[in-house]
Amino acid sequence: EASDRLHATNNFPEFTGRLCPAPCEGACVLGINEPPVTIKQVEVSIVDRAWQEGWITPVVPQELTGRRVAVVGSGPAGLAAAQQLTRAGHGVVVFERADRIGGLLRYGIPEFKMEKRHLDLRLAQMEAEGTEFRTNTDVGVDLTARELIDDFDAVVLAGGATQSRDLPIPG
């Protein structure tokens, strides 16, 4: 039941549980009299146990809509959109410019913060649900916007920021 509750509002609790800095723990009013609720550790423990016990399995849609959706970008936002759309019965193709799926989760988060095996487990689940992944596809270069519009019923743009940008704040 705990795993189901986590997944009801969060596609990827194994990512957020490891990566969130947990500011809520510092603000927890319970901390006035005793240690605050360690929600970050609770979340990680629940989802890790759920994977170990085999409680997290592919959720294959019972009915297909016949509609196709392109998702451009395979970072956390693109993956969450893809999983929800696939589970709703749409044919989903995720396009990724890089050679591997995951965006920031794959290339921006160091292994000591989140082992890539957690990402790979989730990607395998998504593939088993019916999500298709296409890597090495730079939309706008290898595939035009017109092709996406012509070939898909909807397009989700979930591209990440590949270059940093300084804020123009003096001092």
Q: For the regions a protein language model found, what residue spans apply to each?
A:
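Beta1-alpha1 glycine-rich phosphate/pyrophosphate-binding loop at the start
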Residues: 1-10, 32, 36-40, 71-139, ...
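A glycine-/small-polar-enriched, mobile loop at the entrance of the PLP active site in fold-type I
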Residues: 13
